[in-house]
């Protein structure tokens, strides 16, 4: 599992900030000068009419949503301080000659090398585009699809390694519906004005991708319509959001042989082996009807349309790491039209978000050395144990709970894992091949590392200590 440094560190900074608050001399119970909640009120609003605005309106007015955000909370404000600290760590790591600091520094170098990205345009993904062009039949395209999955480009379907929902002691391979460029099936079929506008914006974006690949206006439009037709077919076979909430309907364990019968075109044994998934004889399929239709779509769609489908999703997945024109088209749709942000974050913040996703624990190791000493971890660990002791006392005082039930509650309380500040054992990223090369190649390398890290868990007990 990828651990988010930004989330964990922001929580740590929030704890520290709360701990440092002290009551200002002269404040009263009615108007505590240091009471953030008190000062964030909007007293022009009656709490009887709109309690939310009364309680939060002052803070909302004082903190307008930035142009590069679609929402803004106190958590975002804390994260701004964290961004500055992480940027400082990265800049210092540029000088490192070895260790995890060098890996962090090399990633930051490629992430901030916008000049190379601008000059190379789509060249960094030329190997993948060439592989798609050379795949002249369905089986060859499916091999490319498997390779793209390993690199983090989601095409066709979603696969992941998670705890088995019916046997939480082991890890299992899950296969779920996917392969769409819009968030879920509703975006393909709802007819309200907002969804229709998003769908039209998506068509324009798809057309712009094919134009960037060299198609003239008419051909780009034709390719976009064919692409949308394929995705709409997959969306129609996908379950609605409310149907995805049923854990029993979305848990269908079957053998790989049964999966081959359900969706034979993918030839799952070959596909899994190509993705270095070995020794797996059962999988958990979330939506079997989707895989049945996926099989029909793969068999019934012309190879050139499938090639364009892979090309589009390759560029969609890598656009944030390429030149400004490619990213600009991507942001216009996914950032502005879909998400509501008026402008993108500064590049350095976007790259920190990316680094957090791919190298969060590596960056975190450097972060805690500078900003979160062992003494802080020990202090918060004691706080967790104090909470555990308080819960035990409360259980002891319950008169409605039997002694036998209390014993079970004590056992559960004692076995609850505490994870404070940072892991006791850090992941080993030494095999992740990060170099001073085009950013997208580092992204592929990191995703490849994470893919193999996850599939290596299959069939093994759950690591309860993993962050």
Residue ranges and their predicted role:
Residues 1-7:
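Bacterial N-terminal signal peptides that target proteins for export
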Residues 14-17:
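C-terminal motif of bacterial Sec signal peptides marking the signal peptidase cleavage site
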Residues 19-21:
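Bacterial signal peptide processing site
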Residues 29, 43-50, 54-119:
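Active-site-surrounding "flap" and adjacent substrate/cofactor-binding loops of secreted or lumenal enzymes
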Residues 40-61, 192-211:
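Hydrophobic/aromatic-rich, well-ordered segments within soluble, folded domains that form packed cores
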Residues 93-382:
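Noncatalytic, helix-rich "gating/capping" subdomain that lines the substrate-entry/channel surface
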Residues 262-265, 284-288, 352, 356-360, ...:
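Intrinsically disordered, low-complexity linker/terminal regions across diverse proteins
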């Amino acid at each position: 599992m990828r651990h988010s440094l930004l989330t964990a560190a922001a929580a740590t900074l929030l704890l520290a900030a709360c701990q440092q608050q002290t009551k200002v001399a002269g404040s009263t119970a009615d108007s505590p000068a240091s009471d953030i909640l008190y000062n964030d009120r909007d007293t022009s609003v009656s709490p009887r009419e709109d309690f939310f605005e009364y309680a939060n309106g002052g803070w909302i007015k004082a903190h307008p949503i930035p142009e590069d955000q679609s929402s803004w909370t106190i958590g975002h404000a804390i994260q701004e301080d964290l961004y500055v600290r992480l940027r400082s760590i990265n800049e210092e790591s540029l000088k490192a000659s070895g260790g995890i600091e060098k890996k962090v520094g090399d990633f930051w170098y490629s992430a901030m090398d916008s000049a190379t990205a601008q000059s190379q345009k789509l060249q960094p993904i030329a190997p993948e585009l060439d592989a798609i062009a050379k795949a002249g039949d369905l089986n060859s395209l499916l091999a490319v699809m498997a390779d793209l999955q390993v690199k983090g480009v989601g095409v066709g379907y979603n696969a992941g390694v998670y705890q088995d929902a019916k046997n939480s002691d082991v890890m299992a391979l899950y296969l779920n519906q996917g392969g769409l460029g819009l968030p879920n099936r509703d975006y393909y079929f709802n007819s309200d004005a907002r969804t229709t506008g998003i769908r039209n914006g998506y068509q324009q974006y798809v057309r712009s991708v094919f134009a960037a690949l060299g198609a003239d206006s008419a051909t780009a439009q034709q390719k976009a319509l064919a692409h949308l037709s394929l995705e709409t077919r997959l969306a129609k076979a996908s379950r609605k959001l409310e149907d995805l909430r049923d854990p029993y309907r979305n848990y269908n364990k079957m053998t790989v042989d049964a999966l081959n019968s359900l969706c034979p075109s993918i030839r799952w044994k070959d596909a899994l082996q190509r993705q270095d998934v070995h020794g797996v004889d059962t999988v958990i399929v979330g939506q079997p009807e989707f895989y049945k239709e996926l099989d029909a779509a793969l068999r019934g769609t012309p190879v050139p349309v499938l090639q364009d489908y892979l090309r589009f999703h390759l560029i969609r997945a890598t656009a944030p790491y390429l030149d400004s024109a490619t990213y600009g088209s991507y942001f216009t749709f996914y950032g502005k039209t879909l998400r509501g942000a008026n402008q993108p974050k500064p590049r350095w913040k976007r790259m920190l978000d990316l680094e957090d996703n791919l190298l969060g624990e590596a960056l975190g190791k450097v972060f805690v050395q500078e900003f979160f000493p062992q003494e802080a971890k020990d202090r918060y660990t004691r706080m967790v144990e104090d909470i555990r002791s308080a819960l035990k006392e409360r259980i002891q005082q319950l008169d409605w709970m039997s002694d036998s039930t209390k014993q079970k509650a004590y056992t559960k309380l004692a076995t609850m894992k505490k994870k404070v500040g940072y892991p006791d054992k850090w992941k080993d990223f030494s095999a992740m091949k990060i170099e001073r090369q085009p950013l997208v190649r580092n992204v592929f390398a990191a995703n490849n590392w994470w893919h193999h890290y996850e599939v290596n868990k299959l069939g093994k007990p759950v690591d309860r200590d993993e962050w």
